[in-house]
Curated annotation (Swiss-Prot):
Protein name, as recorded: Protein GrpE
Signal peptide interval: none
Homology family: Belongs to the GrpE family.
Annotated PANTHER family: GRPE PROTEIN, GRPE PROTEIN HOMOLOG, MITOCHONDRIAL
Localisation per UniProt entry: Cytoplasm
One BP annotation, GO: protein folding
Composition skew (Low complexity), residue ranges: 21-58
Amino acid sequence: MENTQENPTSQNPTPADEAARQAAEAASGEPQDQARQPAAAAGEQPAQAQPAGAEAALAEAQAKLAELQESFLRAKAETENVRRRGQEDVAKAHKFAIESFAEHLLPVMDSLEAAVAHSTDDLAKVREGVELTLRQLTGALEKGKVVALNPVGEKFDPHRHQAISMVPADQEPNTVVAVLQKGYVIADRVLRPALVTVAAPK
């Protein structure tokens, strides 16, 4: 028959164990069982506070992200509006670029139509009408910043003049002696160079 009696020393502390426990309690000022309980409770508090702080930080980050997304969408929409308005302005500028210039040419057209409708054998009147029309056309061109080049006496400029020939002349070499065909510039940009003859070197 097996012996089921437990060792009494496993349940009942010996005098030596009791003396060691009492010495430890005296050194700490409180029983060891009570000292372990607050420590365990103190260790649980950060674990409870940490999730609450993390949730608050996550909520703040999500709110900031939503704000940035909204700002981005507004900026994108505004950029698209500016781009569309710019395209419309460019299209209008191309479409009506010569509107003002064409308006200045209308009086010239009126004068030419009137001259054709009114026939006369008086050459003096015909010449007078042509001169008037020419003045109107010149004025219309000048309003459009188109100016004639008539560089007689000026130094030859290959950017504004086209030399047809060089002729003996009293002027300094490379001086424009005669203009065979006027040139024209628009806002300092050459539309057509003037055809000229130039003084030859002596």
